UniProtKB/Swiss-Prot annotation:
Stretch forming the signal peptide: none
GO biological process, one term: cilium assembly
Keywords: Activator, Cilium biogenesis/degradation, DNA-binding, Nucleus, Transcription, Transcription regulation
Disruption of the gene: reported phenotype: Randomization of the left-right body.
Keyword DNA-binding found: yes
Protein name: Forkhead box protein J1-A
Protein species of origin: Danio rerio
Amino acid sequence: MLSMSSMDPWPEGSVGLEEEVVTAAAQAERLDTSTPLQCNTSLDSDNLDDSLTSLQWLQEFSILNASTGQHTSPSSHSHLMGSDAPSSPLAGDPASIGMPLTPGKPTAASFCRVPMFSALPSLVAHGHCPDEVDYKSNPHIKPPYSYATLICMAMQASKKTKITLSCIYKWITDNFCYFRHADPTWQNSIRHNLSLNKCFIKVPRQKDEPGKGGFWKIDPQYAERLLNGAYKKRRLPPVQINPALQHRLRMNAQATGVISRNLSVSPESQQLLKDFEEATSADQNWDPRLAEATMLSCWISGKGTNKRKQPYNHRTGKTPRRSSSPLLVMDEQEDLSSLRGNFDWDALLDSALNGELSLNEGSPLSPTPQDEELMIRGTHISPQEAPVENHVLMETQRSGDEDFDEETFLATAFLQSPWSEVDESNRSDFLGSSTVSIDQLFDLSFGGDLSSKIETLL
């Protein structure tokens, strides 16, 4: 059970806390009124930076003002204005904006860090923008301009069409204090820019002009761009493409994508597939491997002889070529209609071996060729007048050779009848005579008058 006596120490503790806070505030005031020399001495003795661990910033809260009722002295405000550092860590924190803070006083750590920040020769330490920097009097800040821009500024300030290298050096050192105190290697960079940059042109000195060295001027072609700062980093402007050309390229790219997605089939391939399906549906007993090989050979021969079909159209007596492929043309299918159907080849072969099947009986398997007109060296020959030549011509044409010519025909006809028969009564055959014996023939091998011996034999 809790008693009221257990709650009595709480107010007493709160009073003791207020006394400690007041004591700390009094000590802080004594530190503020002390001289900076004492602060530096204490820092040298301690040689520690307590800006992160010090709790002296607690005195800046309003609770201290409510308890003590004291106000800051004008001297503290002068120290704050002279130092660009915040009075406390919370005063410089953006997250503390809007908090009820009193005009603070700099802490010991922040008060002693002011000389270190003010000694840094940088824009951040001084809190100035580049436009507010006086480059003529500030030797610590380098001008934010490229060497090409500095050369162009010197040429524009001279009010002359051409300027010497020494004048460029003089103008840069007069207007920018940084280059007066910097290492003189920047002059080499100026010379390299004049020699390598295409914006500057070297003008030779005339003979009657006094002085030494040549002159330099800005190329009129690049003068406007250089003055506008386009060549500050030597970057060319982006290439402008005609809108019409952009639209055309975009349309071509879309068309290419559509073509790549859709497979195109030529009409020849479609017709070949259609013929193949018709032939396979008409004949059910065809060999797929044979059909595939035949299709390939027909395709190759069709592409190879496409240019040679035209010159032979005027020739007569041409017989269509027979093919073992199921891909038959319509006229061939009509001529060979009697061969359609399923045949028992084993039974046919057995009948032929037994003599039961006669190939001479019945209708012929192939259609009878019609009488055709023959032209040899411009002379008309009817089939009745030249039966042998007509037979040779038909056999030669059935062999499938489309390159048949007259020389082949004449040679074949000559072999059929190389010479005409001579009447045997007008010519004596010595070797073929049956009256001469073998002994008489051997007698001819011995010496003597051969002519007399032959006459006796005859």
